[in-house]
């Protein structure tokens, strides 16, 4: 498999990308990470960029993600919002797990928001869904489907009782 080449190819698997914890709020438009490729106090930011930026890009396709290397004395994340404001988050001497936990608390959606969006996405948007809690309680309400046998009797060529009866 050609995508399994290079440094740590596990980062490009779908299972790994879906396991990301950070889903940014809808107001965030640009997410930039500034760090250096040298220095001990930048180690957590380097690991964060290496391991977590692919997950953030996968989970937030509408957000522009920037990484700026070797331009700053201290590592930081800057989030630009759609109303023109920006937020600066310091990453100095933190490990990558602390960074991701802090970002989830500050600019990430809450668990309740994610659950509500998931429920809304899965149930109501598909017109083929029917049953309890959906817009249609039975498949017979969909145009072009066979009506319920309780209301309209089925034709004889559709009834197993007549098809498979001994002649």
UniProtKB/Swiss-Prot annotation:
GO molecular function: structural constituent of ribosome
UniProt key word Protein biosynthesis: no
Domain of life the protein comes from: Eukaryota
GO CC list: mitochondrial small ribosomal subunit; mitochondrion
Entries under Pfam families matching the protein: L51_S25_CI-B8 (PF05047)
SS bonds (residue pairs): none
Primary residence: mitochondrion
Location(s), subcellular: Mitochondrion
The entry's keywords: Mitochondrion, Ribonucleoprotein, Ribosomal protein
GO biological processes: mitochondrial translation
Subunit and partners: Component of the mitochondrial ribosome small subunit (28S) which comprises a 12S rRNA and about 30 distinct proteins.
Family of the protein in this entry: Belongs to the mitochondrion-specific ribosomal protein mS25 family.
Cross-referenced PANTHER family: MITOCHONDRIAL RIBOSOMAL PROTEIN S25, SMALL RIBOSOMAL SUBUNIT PROTEIN MS25
Protein name: Small ribosomal subunit protein mS25
């Amino acid at each position: 498999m050609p995508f399994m080449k290079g440094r740590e190819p596990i980062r490009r698997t779908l299972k790994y990308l879906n396991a990301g914890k950070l889903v940014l709020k809808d107001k965030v438009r640009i997410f930039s990470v500034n760090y250096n490729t040298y220095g001990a106090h930048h180690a957590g930011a380097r690991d964060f960029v290496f391991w977590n930026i692919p997950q953030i890009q996968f989970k937030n396709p509408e957000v522009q993600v920037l990484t700026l290397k070797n331009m700053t004395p201290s590592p930081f994340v800057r989030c630009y919002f759609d109303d023109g404001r920006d937020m600066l988050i310091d990453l100095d001497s933190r490990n990558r797990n602390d960074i991701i936990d802090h970002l989830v608390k500050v600019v990430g959606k809450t668990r309740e928001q994610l659950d509500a969006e998931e429920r809304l996405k899965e149930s109501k948007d598909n017109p083929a869904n029917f049953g309890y809690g959906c817009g249609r309680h039975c498949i017979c309400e969909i145009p072009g489907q066979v009506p319920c046998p309780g209301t309209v009797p089925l034709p004889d060529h559709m009834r197993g009782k007549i098809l498979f009866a001994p002649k």
